[in-house]
């Protein structure tokens, strides 16, 4: 829940950048994640968490920017990269200046690129990307940019801690890595190989 207190503070701090959103009666956040298809459960749970936290931790405590309420607007990206960018544009066209997404680092990479280009071309309609769970390290390394704000630890940080625990288990001799065939899975595999080699003599067999 501390996450959403940070979001509220962030909205307050960044209000200077967004003239149109500041003067609106309600500060809106577009939640762009899967709400249909095989990943709908993940997106629906995330949406419920955002709505609950915004209502309980922000609106019921007086709102932001001098008492303005916050609202989460749900947009279904169907867990598809192209559809995600369509929904980002839908949000922008509706005057929404805060984009929240977290399921799929591949999609997050596409959104951060779009937001960067949009803000360069539209300095009077700048958008901030609130990345709440896409943990590809590239998003805050090679692709680090001012308009992308990540709340979660990246895959390198998480794997560093996980391999500390693994290193303490003397009975583990071999390990097989299974992961997704896109940016997130590849980042996790690379971090696992790196830290296991540094901390253990475990053989990675696949």
Regions found by a protein language model. Name each.
Residues 30-53, 75-82, 103-104, 178-187:
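Extracytoplasmic "Venus flytrap"
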Residues 18-24:
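Sec/Tat signal peptide C-region and signal peptidase I cleavage site
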């Amino acid at each position: 829940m501390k996450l959403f207190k940070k979001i509220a503070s962030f909205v307050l701090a960044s209000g200077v950048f967004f003239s149109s959103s500041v003067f609106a009666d309600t500060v809106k956040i577009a939640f762009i994640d899967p709400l249909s298809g095989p990943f709908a459960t993940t997106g629906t749970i995330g949406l419920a968490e955002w709505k609950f936290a915004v209502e309980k931790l922000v609106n019921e405590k007086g709102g932001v920017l001098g008492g303005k309420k916050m609202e989460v607007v749900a947009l279904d990206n169907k867990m598809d990269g192209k559809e995600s960018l369509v929904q980002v544009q839908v949000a922008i066209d509706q005057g929404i200046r805060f984009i929240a997404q977290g399921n799929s680092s591949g999609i997050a990479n596409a959104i951060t690129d779009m937001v960067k280009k949009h803000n360069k071309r539209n300095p009077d309609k700048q958008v901030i990307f609130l990345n709440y769970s896409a943990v590809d390290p590239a998003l805050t390394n090679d692709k680090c940019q001012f308009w992308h704000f990540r709340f979660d630890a990246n895959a390198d940080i998480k794997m560093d801690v996980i391999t500390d625990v693994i290193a303490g288990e003397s009975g583990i001799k071999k390990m097989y890595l299974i992961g997704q065939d896109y940016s997130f899975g590849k980042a996790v595999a690379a971090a696992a190989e790196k830290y296991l080699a540094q901390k253990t003599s475990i053989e990675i067999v696949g």
